C-alpha cells in the first residue's frame, strides 16, 4: 500500500520562532525530503522590514534586557534552554574528517570500454526490463557520459583533420624520418628487407586527404594542451547542459575531470551552513516519478490481480463458514433426536409401567379402606340415634293428648360445614371415575350423619317451642342449601 500524503494542519503556532519540518510546503513531494530538512527558524515570515515575530534583527536579540529596572544580563540567559544557540541544526563537521571521505569507496561506474561495447545490449535490455529508480539514475548518468565522450571524440577528430590540412609536410617528414629508423632496427633481424616507399598523403589527381589507418600509431603533440585547447565557440551546439553530471555539491562535471577529482571541493561548499539537499532530492523525485509513470500500467494490473485474489479468498472463507454452520445445525438436530428417543424408551420401559400401576392400586386400596371406616362410623351413630329417639317417644306419649306433636323440620346446615364438605382434599386427582364415585358416596355419608345428629336434637327444640306454636302465628319450613318458606296460616 502507498503511504498517505502527509498534508496536515499547521503543527507549529504562527508566532513561534521555530517551524516544524511537516509545516514546510516544499516537503509535500517526498518523504525523503521531509527527513532531510531539519527544523528551521521562522523569524521573518511577513513582508520585508515588517516581521511578525520580532521587530529587530537576530543579532540584536542578545542585547535585549530582561525588563524592569535592571538592564544587566546574566551569563546563563545567553545559554538558556530556549535559545537557538543550543540547537544543533546541521552537522558542521569538516568534510575531510567525515567517514565517507576517509574511507574512499570505489565508483560503481563501469569502464569506458565496457560502455562502448555494451551500448547496444544495455539499450535493448533497458527497454525490456522494468527499471528501478536507482537503475534509471545510473542509466541516465551512463548515457550522458557516452554522449559527452562521443561529442569530445568528434570535436577532437575535427581538430586533428584541420591541423593535418594546415601542416601536412611536417607530418610527412616525421613519417619519412621514422622509416629509416625502422629500417635500421629491422636490418639486424631480417637481412632480406625491402624498403617500402612512404605513400604520399595527397594524391596529385584528386588533391584530397587520405585517411591513414594506423591504429597502433600514436601522434605526439608539441604541447600538453594542443588537442584539448577548445574554446566555447568550438563546443557542439546541441550540447544539453541540463543533462551534464554533477557532483555532491551541485557543480557540473565536464569530461573526465569529475571522475579524477572527486575529493576536491570549493571553498564555499565546504564552509557553508545553509546547504539544503533539496535540489538533489528533487532530481531523485523526478526520476522516481518517471519510473512510476513507466510502471503505472503494470502496477495497476498487479493491484487488480491482487484484489481479485483477495476477493476469491474471502469468498472461499465465507463458503467454509457456511459449511461449518450447516454442520453445527445438523449435529444439534441429531443430538435432540437422540435425546427424545432415549426419553421415549425410558417412558416405555415395562418395569417403570409396572411400578406406576402398583402405586395406583395401593392408593385406591387406601382410599377404599378410609371410606369403609367412615361408613362404619355413620352406621354406628345411626343405631345410637334410633335408640335415643325411642326413649324420647316413650316419655312424650303421656303428654301427647295435650300437646300436639309438631312436625319435625330439617335443621339448617351452616356455611362452614358446607365449605368443609366441598373442600375435602382429593388424594387421587388423576384417578378413574370409580374413585370419584366413591368420594361422592363418602360425602353423602357425612351429610346423612349430620342430618341424623340434627334429628336427635330436634325433639328438645320442639318441646321448648310449644309455647310459641300455641300463639297466633308460627313459621314452618326447612332449609338445607336453598331456603324453602311455607305460607303463613292463621289459626
Curated annotation (Swiss-Prot):
Alphabetical UniProt keywords: Cell cycle, Cell division, Coiled coil, Membrane, Mitochondrion, Mitochondrion outer membrane, Phosphoprotein
Main location: other
Polar residues compositional bias, start-end: 461-472
InterPro entries per the UniProt record, alphabetical: MMR1
Membrane topology summary: Peripheral membrane protein
GO biological process, one term: cell division
Region (Interaction with MYO2): 300-439
Post-translational modification as stated in the protein's UniProt record: Phosphorylated by the cyclin-CDK PCL7-PHO85.
Modified residues (Phosphothreonine): 12
Annotated Gene Ontology cellular component terms: cellular bud; cellular bud neck; cellular bud tip; cortical endoplasmic reticulum; incipient cellular bud site; mitochondrial outer membrane; mitochondrion
Domain of life of the source: Eukaryota
Location of this chain's protein in the cell: Bud tip; Bud neck; Mitochondrion outer membrane
Residue positions where Phosphoserine is found in the record: 16, 37
GO MF assignments: phospholipid binding
Protein's UniProt keywords contain Cell cycle: yes
Residue runs in coiled coils: 295-384
Region (Disordered): 419-491
Other noteworthy facts: Present with 1070 molecules/cell in log phase SD medium.
Function: Involved in the guiding of mitochondrial tubules to the bud tip during cell division.
Quaternary structure and partners: Interacts with MYO2 and PCL7.
Protein name as catalogued: Mitochondrial MYO2 receptor-related protein 1
Species in which this protein is naturally found: Saccharomyces cerevisiae (strain ATCC 204508 / S288c) (Baker's yeast)
Lineage: Eukaryota, Fungi, Dikarya, Ascomycota, Saccharomycotina
Gene assigned in the entry: MMR1
